[in-house]
């Protein structure tokens, strides 16, 4: 399965003789590639102001779902409720056995049916099915994303946790002598409060 989003943003700012241009994002966007036969998950991140595009070999984690008795209708599908914890967040998911595929959005998978709706308890993550065609006669070619730079999951997490430091170092390396940027340390998200993944398996 593959999830993607496109993001292209350009910023051009001139102030006191200093010109800066940031362009990031690309037509490929962010991807989550999963191979269920090989239990393999590859992430792809587009170019940002701080980092070039790169891929990540993530860890295949089976979420310990607990299926509840509650049911609801989503669109034309009968769905069951399931709850589970994944990397520091507690999720509620609604899946349908009418589409008996263990897939879902983001990194949520492993239920006996397709996940059509999911949300974490703090509402930092929320996804709802808008429309679906099942079965379908369309054929899709899904290929593993490849980039020159590859990181393991620990390297990726470190980079994201220190993204401000990396960007600051990059900016300062391009500034004239005597000119530098500094950051507001009070705004650093040290506990990953605003990130979807808050706690990783090696941090327990």
Model-assigned labels for residue ranges:
Residues 1-204:
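Extended soluble regions of mature proteins
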């Amino acid at each position: 399965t593959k999830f993607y989003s496109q993001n292209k943003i350009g910023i051009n700012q001139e102030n006191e003789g200093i010109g800066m241009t940031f362009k990031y994002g690309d037509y490929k966007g962010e991807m989550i590639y999963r191979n269920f036969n090989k239990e393999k998950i590859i992430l792809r991140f587009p170019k940002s102001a701080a980092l070039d595009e790169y891929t990540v070999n993530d860890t295949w984690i089976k979420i310990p779902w607990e299926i509840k008795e509650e049911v609801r209708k989503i669109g034309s599908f009968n769905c069951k409720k399931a709850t589970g914890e994944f990397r520091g967040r507690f999720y509620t998911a609604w899946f349908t056995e009418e589409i008996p595929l263990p897939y879902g959005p983001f990194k949520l998978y492993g239920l006996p049916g397709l996940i059509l709706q999911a949300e974490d308890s703090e509402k930092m993550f929320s996804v709802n099915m808008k429309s679906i065609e099942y079965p379908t006669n369309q054929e899709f070619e899904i290929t593993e994303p490849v980039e020159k730079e590859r990181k393991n999951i620990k390297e990726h997490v470190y980079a994201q946790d220190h993204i401000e430091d990396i960007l600051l170092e990059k900016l300062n390396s391009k500034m004239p002598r005597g000119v530098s940027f500094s950051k507001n340390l009070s705004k650093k998200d040290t506990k990953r409060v605003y990130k979807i993944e808050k706690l990783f398996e090696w941090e327990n």
